[in-house]
């Protein structure tokens, strides 16, 4: 009798991706975050779909439609807060996933890494547009400030901003198109995830040692399927605790005030997962320079494979590079903290120092340290 799992055209794809997939025998829990990101994406699409059934993308009714979801729709409050806090979990997993790729040298899988950078940009765009939809004060002013950054582009800047707005300010047209893009982008992200996995399965996963594991592979199921299941339990437990006990912990109180173009909030700031980039943007006094630094803070990830000068792939056996990696992590946490603070001293100088150190670490210190470690190998 033929095995349907191995012969059926559709089942064969699933089998090669999630069941009989040859996996390195030594991958740690840091490799769990890929599957957790898939779980987060599923949660976001399902909850988002139910929210879209009740939401209205009109400036006069958007805020009250979100209030209606929370008050009148069956379990609407839990759907809304799962979606809002699910985004935070999504970014937490994303940052750890990228960090693991940097630490263990997964960026040497060029195609997979580049699609990953595109995915990060797509998820950030989706999250930004989603934050605008409740049409609270922070939604409106966040949209105004961030879209206005494009006016820094020479010659075409202002035309571009008004084209995105669909008028002369953030208004009904802006909200409608942001809702349309926020709805369609997760499906584009899903397609990119599939491409990401196709490229990954061409080469096979990396492992903590950074050396080839072709001689020692084990099937994905049952070993890593159960390991991923444990990670999913931890993720869902954390998300449930967040949603049920303190759903507004990561949100901004200003967003419970309906959008008012005549009153500017005292501190305009994005959600916590954008604060590091926002701090880099604010640390440069020049508008165009700030926008370029903001773009580079993410796009620099695409340069990392070309800045890799070490003979070893992973930093597991490179203590100096390990120190630099954790300096980078501490630096990003500092930038996240600074992004949420008002623009005054000493926060300005701390933000500027951390921004310089961020680019200096990635562009100069890490490649030079790797070259020095190559010399040490010969001693």
UniProtKB/Swiss-Prot annotation:
Cofactor binding mode and count = Binds 2 heme b groups non-covalently.
Any single GO CC term annotated in Swiss-Prot or TrEMBL for this entry = respiratory chain complex III
Annotated residues that bind heme b b562 are located at 83, 182
Which Gene3D superfamilies does the UniProt record give?
Cytochrome Bc1 Complex, Chain C
Sites where the protein binds heme b b566: 97, 196
- What is the protein's given name? Cytochrome b
Q: Binding residues for a ubiquinone, per the UniProt record?
A: 201
As a miscellaneous remark, the entry gives: Heme 1 (or BL or b562) is low-potential and absorbs at about 562 nm, and heme 2 (or BH or b566) is high-potential and absorbs at about 566 nm.
Its transmembrane ranges are 33-53, 77-98, 113-133, 178-198, 226-246, 288-308, 320-340, 347-367
Tell me its family.
Belongs to the cytochrome b family.
The family database entries (SUPFAM superfamilies) matched by this protein are listed as:
a domain/subunit of cytochrome bc1 complex (Ubiquinol-cytochrome c reductase), Transmembrane di-heme cytochromes
Judging by the UniProt lineage, the source's domain of life is Eukaryota
Organism name? Xanthonycticebus pygmaeus
One Pfam entry for this protein is Cytochrom_B_C
């Amino acid at each position: 009798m033929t095995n349907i799992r191995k012969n059926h055209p559709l089942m064969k794809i699933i089998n090669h991706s999630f069941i009989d997939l040859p996996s390195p025998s030594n991958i740690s829990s840091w490799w769990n975050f890929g599957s957790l990101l898939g779980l987060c994406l599923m949660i976001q699409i399902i909850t988002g779909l139910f929210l879209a059934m009740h939401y209205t993308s009109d400036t006069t009714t958007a805020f009250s439609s979100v209030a209606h979801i929370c008050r009148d729709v069956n379990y609407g409050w839990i759907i809304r807060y799962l979606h809002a806090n699910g985004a935070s979990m999504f970014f937490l997993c994303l940052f750890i996933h990228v960090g693991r790729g940097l630490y263990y040298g997964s960026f040497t899988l060029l195609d997979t890494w580049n699609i990953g950078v595109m995915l990060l940009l797509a998820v950030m765009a989706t999250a930004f547009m989603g934050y605008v939809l409740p049409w609270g004060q922070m939604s409106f002013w966040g949209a105004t400030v961030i879209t206005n950054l494009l006016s820094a582009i020479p010659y075409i800047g202002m035309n571009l901003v008004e084209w995105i707005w669909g008028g002369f300010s953030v208004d009904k047209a802006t909200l409608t198109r942001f809702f349309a893009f926020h709805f369609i982008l997760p499906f584009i992200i899903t397609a990119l995830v599939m491409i990401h996995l196709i490229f990954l399965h061409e080469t096979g996963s990396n492992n903590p040692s950074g050396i080839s594991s072709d001689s020692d592979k084990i099937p994905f199921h049952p070993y890593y399927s159960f390991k991923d299941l444990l990670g999913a339990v931890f993720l869902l437990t954390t998300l449930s605790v967040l949603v049920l006990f303190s759903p507004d912990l990561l949100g901004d109180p200003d967003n419970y005030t309906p959008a008012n173009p005549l009153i500017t909030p005292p501190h305009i700031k994005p959600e916590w997962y954008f604060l590091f980039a926002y701090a880099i943007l604010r640390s440069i006094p020049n508008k165009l320079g700030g926008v370029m630094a903001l773009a580079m803070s993410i796009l620099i990830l695409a340069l990392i494979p070309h800045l890799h000068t070490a003979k070893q792939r992973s930093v597991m056996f490179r203590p100096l590079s390990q120190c630099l990696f954790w300096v980078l992590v501490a630096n990003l946490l500092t930038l996240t903290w600074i992004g949420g603070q008002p623009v005054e001293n000493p926060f300005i100088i701390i933000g500027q120092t951390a921004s310089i150190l961020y680019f200096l670490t990635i562009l100069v210190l890490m490649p030079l340290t790797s070259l020095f470690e190559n010399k040490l190998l010969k001693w």
